[in-house]
């Protein structure tokens, strides 16, 4: 019988399960590993999810990962290769009682890396969307308890829309962060000039940085459009 699809309430131990596995993965991948990220629904606090920890290691060179297959197998993982996504190495642990998935990407593959990070961070920052997505998954799990294709197909359109919103939101957050950083630098320069002019460096810096933060925030919040008018 196929593996049963279950969506359960959030479990605090998911974070510690990730951290425990993170140490093992870093030890296996060694210096090739740049970072290991907890992704998927189990990485979003208070969000119901399938009780499978999704882990995304990022490496310098993906071609070196296959040489570690025996080490991953020793930890209980099945090595599945790309498993439908070019540029990925996928590992599954737990058999029919699945507990972990590992999705390894090379650092040059920012498209896949950023879409995973963007969705995670968007759901963490938008609890209403997280609740909506969880409700959809619970509905699909009840409708397709032993049909993984039916479950995945049922949320495909929602996930596409979610990824698009998450990536736009992430881009805006990045612009805002850049704008604020530039504003602080610009404000500090203005503040120094004010301080020298009025013989009060502290006051000048406060005024300058405040002005810089204001303009930096406005700059970072501006919508960007391309030549076709698309954001």
Q: What do the predicted segments below correspond to?
A:
Residues 1-37, 160:
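Helical scaffold of the NTase/Pol beta-like nucleotidyltransferase catalytic core
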Residues 76-110:
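Conserved catalytic core of two-metal-ion nucleotidyltransferases
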Residues 67-75:
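Short amphipathic alpha-helices in soluble, non-transmembrane regions
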Residues 171-188, 192-231:
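Helix-termini ("caps") and immediately adjacent flexible loops/tails
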Residues 111-173:
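Catalytic cores of NTP-dependent nucleotidyl/adenyl transfer enzymes across multiple folds
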